[in-house]
From Swiss-Prot:
Species this protein is from: Myxococcus xanthus (strain DK1622)
Keyword Hydrolase applies: yes
Top class in the EC scheme: hydrolase
Keywords assigned by UniProt, alphabetized: Arginine metabolism, Hydrolase
Functional pathway: Amino-acid degradation; L-arginine degradation via AST pathway; L-glutamate and succinate from L-arginine: step 2/5
InterPro entries xref list: AstB_sf (IPR037031), SuccinylArg_d-Hdrlase_AstB (IPR007079)
Active site: 172, 246, 364
Residue positions binding substrate: 17-26, 108, 135-136, 210, 248, 358
Family assignment from sequence similarity: Belongs to the succinylarginine dihydrolase family.
Pfam families associated with the record: AstB
Superkingdom classification of source: Bacteria
Name under which the protein is recorded: N-succinylarginine dihydrolase
Catalytic activity reported: N(2)-succinyl-L-arginine + 2 H2O + 2 H(+) = N(2)-succinyl-L-ornithine + 2 NH4(+) + CO2
């Protein structure tokens, strides 16, 4: 079984809308000009780098934005141009919400369980409903369509519908999920949550907790996971209030290794004790304290929103944002991870600033899917990374993406036409078929 990182292509409407309360980077860059072409090329460069390390790499397409489907559902009628013009005039905030390129953060696209862990021996995928934020909730339908197109062979894959789109079952996807495993032990799934729909638990006071316990429990049932191999740790309210709106802002795990901040989970010490019992002596964890790495620095530099990757030689490497190198406390923590008795032997720093400015580091940009060779062969879409695909996608970006996008540019109907033209071509490049509503 091999891990594949399905990275989200940054969409043509990448902009700084400041749409997510609790996402400090998003709020601090609101209204600034963005650079969609650079953003997409930075994402492709990360894919190239990860693939060159010998790690499985694939791609997921962006979604059509502005979402004319969503705007029409909100009462704007007429031609595409009339819908956009009227929304810009009457409810500019709705145009911003429906123009977000946030689907690039595919860690929120779905939660995935490998066939080795599921009762029916299939890979299970559930698109996240993302119901807490409107600009993200409108992604779920298209995500479901895309995943069904890629993972279409029902002998190997079970693609579920998103959980019911209510606050009771608010689901943020794999950004709150970690799978750990050691040789000779069953994989352990951490399905974290920040609040409960029915239980009285202490929550954050400054920023909203997005994922519910009930959603995490439903995912475990849908994916047919053994109850003994699932843990439901609560996100630390203080961590959420510091800006860790998803678990992957303060924790990241891979196979037998977990690195986390002490504010990632309530009772992290108790959680680690249970993990050692379930995973055995090969399990390794490194904890950053508030004294060593203040939460504000962790949220600013995103050392935990790194990718921890298993290399072909069995060692691990961290792919971190360049901000982690530029922030002394974050850099020193990552250096300690390498120096200690862990599988991690190297840290690589990459420039994904266009995404970071909106609150998304390397880990946000990828969805992990574990596949056997047979399962990999059952996927017929051309989504797996090759140098030839890289060149094709880079050329596609340069042909279709604007160099600079300013807030007022979202009001230009031509932008929607450019995006649909680009995505129509992309579905042919990736051999996806008609996955978008404008293609049907």
């Amino acid at each position: 079984m091999r891990e594949y990182n399905f990275d989200g292509l940054v969409g043509p409407t990448h902009n700084y809308g400041g749409l997510s309360p609790g996402n400090l980077a998003s709020q601090s860059h609101v209204g600034e000009p963005s650079h969609p072409r650079d953003a997409a090329l930075q994402g492709l460069e990360k894919m190239r780098f990860v693939s060159a390390l010998g790690v499985g790499q694939a791609v997921l397409p962006p979604q059509p934005r502005p979402s004319l489907h969503a705007l029409r559902a909100l009462g704007f009628t007429g031609s595409d141009e009339e819908v956009i013009t009227r929304a810009a005039r009457e409810a500019e905030h709705l145009l911003r919400l429906t123009s977000s390129a946030s689907s690039m953060w595919t860690a929120n696209a779905a939660t995935v369980a490998p066939s080795a862990d599921t009762a029916d021996g299939r890979v299970h995928l559930t698109p996240a409903n993302l119901s807490q934020m409107y600009h993200r909730a409108i992604e779920a339908e298209t995500t479901h369509s895309v995943l069904r197109a890629i993972f279409s062979n029902e002998k190997y894959f079970a693609v579920h519908a998103p959980l019911p789109g209510s606050g009771h079952f608010a689901d943020e996807g794999a950004a709150n999920h970690t799978r750990l495993a050691t040789p000779g032990h069953a994989g352990v799934h951490l399905l974290a949550w920040g609040r409960s729909a029915w239980q009285d638990v202490q929550g954050p006071s400054r920023f909203p907790a997005r994922q519910t316990l009930e959603a995490s429990q439903a995912l475990a049932r849908l994916h047919q996971l053994d109850a003994k191999s699932v843990l439901f740790p609560q996100q630390h309210p203080e961590g959420i209030d510091a800006g860790a709106f998803h678990t992957d802002v303060l924790a990241v795990g891979n196979e037998r290794f977990l690195m986390l901040h002490e504010l990632a989970f309530v009772d992290h010490a108790g959680l680690l004790a249970v993990l050692r019992e379930k995973l055995g002596q090969d399990f390794r964890a490194v904890v950053a304290t508030k004294a060593e790495l203040p939460a504000k620095d962790a949220v600013k530099a995103y050392p935990f929103n790194s990718q921890v990757l298993t290399l072909p030689d069995g060692t691990m490497a961290i792919v971190a944002p360049i901000e982690s190198r530029e922030t002394p406390a974050a850099r020193q923590f990552l250096e300690r991870v390498v120096a200690e008795d862990t599988p991690v032997k190297a840290v690589h720093y990459l420039d994904v600033r266009q995404s970071m400015n909106n609150g998304g580091g390397p880990a946000c940009l990828r969805q992990r899917v574990w596949l056997t060779d047979e399962e990999r062969g059952a996927i017929k879409a051309d989504v797996f990374y090759t140098p030839a695909l890289h060149d094709s996608l880079a050329g596609w970006v340069r042909r279709h993406y604007r160099e600079v996008l300013r807030p007022k540019d979202l009001q230009d109907p031509q932008l929607a036409r450019e995006t649909m033209t680009a995505l129509d071509e992309l579905t042919r490049i990736l051999n996806l078929g008609s996955v978008y509503d404008f293609q049907r």
